[in-house]
From Swiss-Prot:
PROSITE patterns: NOS. Its cofactor is heme; (6S)-5,6,7,8-tetrahydrofolate. This is Nitric oxide synthase oxygenase. GO terms for biological process: nitric oxide biosynthetic process. Heme binds at C62. Keywords: Heme, Iron, Metal-binding, Oxidoreductase. The gene is nos. It comes from the Bacteria.
Length: 358
């Protein structure tokens, strides 16, 4: 089974990279021998880099795949000690942030006996009973159990929670200067500033498995950049997240939120305008949802020219604001999952769950 997955990946990648059949067959022969001897095989650095890029290209839920080939891949498979691990994490955050001109990065640790990360994203805000991000309550409880104490605000940056092989779970509090944040304001509605809203610049996903040719990398944090609606519609407005619709509408001085007033819709539009222009004011990369959809159209055309079918999950590719203005709303997608790819960890796995409460 493993060899078949390896074979499919190697043949696909090597052909895309224009390798001759003789070289492909030699590599497959070596992999087959390695699997027979050890039960697994090791990717070359080139395979790791290209495989990670292919995983982004194959990510059905991602609207930003046009830039898959620009992914910066850090091979951290040799990282085993704490100092090197923490250094690699801060390096990733620094390079990805790039003083606001965000760059897509992935740091890939060893498939076995590597470090574990318990955070959903490398940077996220704590969730308390009465404030903060409800989506992060479990991670916040774990951080508290380990001895971390937040300030109890809506936007306390959670520490990195990690575990090295044969060691206990620990937390690392980021230096304030490492985390770039954007205060949210609206140039036409100054009252919005009184809500003290802000959001971090770089979304670095750290709770997914990277699978390349049958090899699973359970710790491989990766980032692109935000599409505005991820913050302005989902994070701030969803009732199971910050649930700020009423407060935002009040800041915009909308006197009613009756459905037939359309003020709920207006509040969403104005908040997304505020998020987008706040990021731009701070010099931080972000894309609006309509531009992102246009970029995805270009990605589809590029893939068609290469003879590759684009797979996708429609409910994720249609943005949550004015989706009918985008072309991807108006046709379906084949949701077949290709390899390489990113996968959510199985619920029975405790790889990124609280080791004290699972």
């Amino acid at each position: 089974m493993l060899f078949k997955e390896a074979q499919a990946f190697i043949e696909n990648m090597y052909k895309e990279c224009h390798y001759e059949t003789q070289i492909i067959n030699k590599r497959l022969h070596d992999i087959e021998l390695e699997i027979k001897e050890t039960g697994t095989y090791t990717h070359t650095e080139e395979e790791l880099i290209y495989g990670a890029k292919m995983a982004w290209r194959n990510s059905n839920r991602c609207i930003g795949r046009l830039f898959w080939d620009s992914l910066n891949v850090i091979d951290a498979r040799d990282v085993t000690d704490e100092a090197s691990f923490l250094s690699s994490i801060t390096y990733h955050i620094t390079q990805a942030t790039n003083e606001g001109k965000l760059k897509p990065y992935i740091t890939i640790y060893a498939p076995k006996d590597g470090p574990k990360i318990f955070n959903n994203q490398l940077i996220r805000y704590a969730g308390y009973d009465n404030c903060g991000d409800p989506a992060e309550k479990e991670v916040t409880r774990l951080a508290n159990h380990l001895g971390w104490k937040g300030k109890g605000t809506n936007f306390d940056v959670l520490p990195l929670i990690y575990q090295l092989p044969n060691e206990s779970v620990k937390f690392y509090e980021y230096p304030t200067s490492l985390i770039k944040e954007v205060p949210i304001e609206h140039n036409h509605y100054p009252k919005l500033r009184k809500l003290n809203l802000k959001w971090y610049a770089v979304p670095i996903i750290s709770n997914m498995d990277l699978k390349i040719g049958g090899i699973v990398y359970p710790t491989a944090p990766f980032n692109g950049w935000y599409m505005v609606t991820e913050i302005g519609v989902r994070n701030f407005i969803d009732d199971y997240r910050y649930n700020l619709l009423e407060k935002v509408a009040d800041a915009f001085e909308f006197d009613t939120l009756k459905n037939n007033s359309f003020n709920k819709d207006r509040a969403l539009v104005e908040l997304n305008y505020a998020v987008y222009h706040s990021f731009k004011k701070e010099g931080v990369s972000i894309v609006d949802h309509l531009t992102a959809a246009k970029q995805f159209e270009l990605f589809e055309r590029n893939e068609a020219q290469q003879g590759r079918q684009v797979t996708g999950k429609w409910s994720w590719l249609a943005p949550p604001l004015s989706p009918t203005l985008t072309s991807n709303y108006h046709h379906g997608y084949d949701n077949t999952v290709k390899d390489p790819n990113f996968f959510y960890k199985k619920k029975e796995s405790n790889a990124n769950q609280c080791p004290f409460h699972h």
